[in-house]
């Protein structure tokens, strides 16, 4: 089997395709969460603490000189990134929790006993007939 056909067999497997779809959806979800945090959550928080825009919060370590830009610690962006992470982690936690609950419900659901095969049914009837004959004698 050639390298190309091996790769094709690997790439077409369900798990690889599912993983790729998950990564793409995860990246899109990350962008949505970043927008949610930056555009919806942080402005009211900034307003509550005095009209501060968190993305602008920074400590200047060295001022700009000529063409050399300033060296800054942009801790406001870091706070937003931490909030992004917390929201994504919480969403993943809730998703995993829901999946685990569904798995537990499936495991707890009583399964019907297997229907005996025709051979087992016949053997059971023969056993019962032999016991009945033994009890008569």
UniProtKB/Swiss-Prot annotation:
<dbReference type="GO" id="GO:0005886">
    <property type="term" value="C:plasma membrane"/>
</dbReference>
<dbReference type="InterPro" id="IPR036019">
    <property type="entry name" value="MscL_channel"/>
</dbReference>
<keyword id="KW-0812">Transmembrane</keyword>
<dbReference type="Pfam" id="PF01741">
    <property type="entry name" value="MscL"/>
</dbReference>
<comment type="subunit">
    <text>Homopentamer.</text>
</comment>
<keyword id="KW-1003">Cell membrane</keyword>
<dbReference type="InterPro" id="IPR019823">
    <property type="entry name" value="Mechanosensitive_channel_CS"/>
</dbReference>
<keyword id="KW-0813">Transport</keyword>
<keyword id="KW-0407">Ion channel</keyword>
<keyword id="KW-0472">Membrane</keyword>
<keyword id="KW-1133">Transmembrane helix</keyword>
<keyword id="KW-0406">Ion transport</keyword>
<keyword id="KW-0997">Cell inner membrane</keyword>
<dbReference type="GO" id="GO:0008381">
    <property type="term" value="F:mechanosensitive monoatomic ion channel activity"/>
</dbReference>
<dbReference type="InterPro" id="IPR037673">
    <property type="entry name" value="MSC/AndL"/>
</dbReference>
<feature type="transmembrane region" description="Helical">
    <location>
        <begin position="9"/>
        <end position="29"/>
    </location>
</feature>
<feature type="transmembrane region" description="Helical">
    <location>
        <begin position="79"/>
        <end position="99"/>
    </location>
</feature>
<comment type="similarity">
    <text>Belongs to the MscL family.</text>
</comment>
<comment type="function">
    <text>Channel that opens in response to stretch forces in the membrane lipid bilayer. May participate in the regulation of osmotic pressure changes within the cell.</text>
</comment>
<dbReference type="InterPro" id="IPR001185">
    <property type="entry name" value="MS_channel"/>
</dbReference>
<protein>
    <recommendedName>
        <fullName>Large-conductance mechanosensitive channel</fullName>
    </recommendedName>
</protein>
